[in-house]
């Protein structure tokens, strides 16, 4: 069978390695195909793969190539629509999963030479089912182990972990052990679920080489102050404990936003304001994000009320 010419398009840009495209590249190269980033309709391609992670609110789609026998579009971003209620909705019928033989390919890191870290996703799914998040709709409400660390890592000094809720996975002890044994600097990019962390988890985390830890306090109706305080007491760092994402512009009042921000700061965490549907967010929410996320301003002006005067 003659080899094919394959084009790849990372619709979101090249700011972070796209795991699906790296696997697709590895699969086609293993089959003797030529793989490159699509760059012009002057070039004919047998197949062009377009991958999009984010919704149109953050990443606009790009035109489909016209000089290709087949164009395959996939990724969460192609499954999200914005409803009349102003909220995103995930259409599972549009979800295009990678074939099993592609899913099992070791990622082709060579297509992103600007990055020197590994990217892993060793578990999928999340039991939370948060209305602003698409993980449960896409992957299910049970966190399950889907791979080993060695399926992604071959000695890189850093690993960016994409598991949506590794702390909810029944096999988390095994996965935590695998990550520790790499000796690599670890970054749980999707955050750790503070509600599920136990003493064994904290002990494992204390033995890891870490970038900044990430957590979330998205729903102000959840009283998580005790959980955050327990982790702070057990974690080896006593300052700069971790970054905590605080969702705003999604069923929360300004009073609730500020309570989370002030409480987290007082315990040694770094709150980070996330704005839902930012293009349509009110001015005050955008000011809150600017104040909180600029640490020079945040550390010099302790109260948001003073910042907006």
Indicate residue ranges for each PLM-predicted region.
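Core AdoMet radical
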Residues: 8, 13, 49-53, 134-231, ...
